Amino acid sequence: PNNRRLITIEEGSREFDLVKRDAQGNILNSVVHLLTRPSENPALNINQDFLLERVLRKHPDVIGVGEMRSAAESLSAAESSRTGHTVCTTIHSNSCNSTYRRMMTLAKRKYNMDDSILMQIMVEAYPIIVFTKQLEDRSRKIMEIIEGEDYQDGRLIAHSLYKYEVEDNVTDDRGETR
């Protein structure tokens, strides 16, 4: 929506394209794009964790965090979400359920916290997980959407909201499967 303040944080290059324009090219929404700036000098190093801390002071409606790859990003993005901000991010995983475990194991690399506590943090921070996959025909599909409810006794409690199911594969005249 045009009345939402969006702030994106990305590493290296800008991939999010969230600016909306009208037919005359006027910008309709409020988007601030931030990029990390790695430096060997710690005083000059600007990483995602550093930017996340500062973004919270700007009162965003939505924070877009580029691909989650490190322990600091994993926990700081989750903590930002737990402050009431909507945080959208991407991460490589094999399924909706494994996404929570992947975020937890990333955080575990740096933070000596109990697995169940980290998993509860991730489920609270990211109640909705969307899993996409590239299929054999090279199309990318949303395979599943789940709503994480809780993590108890070493078990994720989640509800499937959507599941893509392939009912039939068809081979066309060129031998391509669709």
Q: Language-model segments: which ranges?
A:
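Switch/coupling sub-region of P-loop NTPases
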Residues: 2-123, 133-134
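Conserved P-loop NTPase
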Residues: 123-178
